[in-house]
Regions:
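A residue-level marker of the well-folded mature domains of exported/periplasmic proteins
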Residues: 1-276
Length: 276
């Protein structure tokens, strides 16, 4: 939308496309003269790559766990483990019980790496912190996520990692805290969401648009452009919790953030399934 507002592009968008319809929609966009097709191929890898092969003059930038594919298929992924680590530090400092509950959708690399980074950050602040981890095997089932979160609260968790919708609702209802993922929902949960790891796609999209415009688009892994040094991710401002998070924790988080940006500290990318 920002590129459109600047008068740089015209674009069309389709939302909630079923996996069975994905290839058809991609082909329609490719045949309509669009120069760049952007989307997610996580569950439709074979179909997406097949379309790209059939339209070699069209550029594709797709969310994928796989590698770039010649001559026109670039990939991106949610490498926002850095702000996830920082959010974990905040969580470790804010949990009074030392017990944190984590509710995820599926134990896939894109979810695992963020959970593992979050856990590592929490452990830096509180090495004795304990985690409860549940996967609900769904991308969108707020009631199920909420139920899982309630179970963790009943076992002593006073802070929840909200990888799925429904978790922050559970935290709000029980007067507990939550940490958000990918987007900032603090406006909806001002007394609940203490921190969030945000993902910004603008650096990746802007790069792809420039390369297409210059006729220089080639297969590339855009993963690094989701990292903090490229402004592809960040720890959300503490907002309503600015005066509630202890100053010592804020100082530690800011120091770690500076080290990450300076290349002095690297957050490990661990795609393995996290364990309690």
């Amino acid at each position: 939308k920002a590129a459109e507002a600047r008068g740089e592009i015209e674009y069309k968008a389709s939302e909630n496309v079923a996996n069975a319809d994905y290839e058809r929609v991609m082909r329609e966009y490719a045949t309509q003269g669009n120069q760049l097709i952007l989307g997610e191929a996580f569950a439709v890898e074979a179909a997406a790559r097949k379309v790209a092969k059939d339209f070699p003059k069209v550029s594709f930038l797709m969310g994928s766990s796989g590698k770039p594919q010649a001559p026109n298929f670039s990939v991106f992924d949610n490498f926002i483990q850095e702000p996830s680590y920082l959010a974990g530090m905040v969580a470790g400092g804010m949990s009074k019980s030392g017990k944190i509950g984590m509710v995820g959708g599926y134990p896939i690399p894109e979810v695992n790496r963020l959970m593992n980074a979050f856990m590592a950050g929490a452990k830096e602040v509180n090495p004795k912190v304990q985690f409860s981890i549940t996967f609900i095997n769904s991308w969108f089932d707020p009631p199920k996520a909420k139920e899982a979160a309630f179970a963790m609260i009943d076992k002593g968790a006073d802070l929840l990692y909200a990888e799925r919708f429904g978790v922050s609702d559970a935290a709000k209802e029980r007067g507990k805290l939550a940490v958000g993922n990918v987007i900032n929902t603090q406006d909806k949960y001002p007394d609940t969401v203490v921190a969030s790891a945000l993902w910004h796609m603008e650096p990746s999209i802007d790069r792809a648009l420039k390369l297409v415009k210059d006729g220089k688009f080639t297969p590339e892994d855009y993963g690094p452009y989701s990292m903090m040094k490229h402004k592809g991710s960040e720890l959300a401002p503490l907002g309503t919790f600015e005066k509630k998070v202890p100053a010592a924790i804020v100082a530690k988080v800011k120091a770690k953030e500076a080290d990450i940006l300076a290349g002095k500290f690297t957050v490990k990318v661990d795609d393995g399934q996290p364990k309690s």
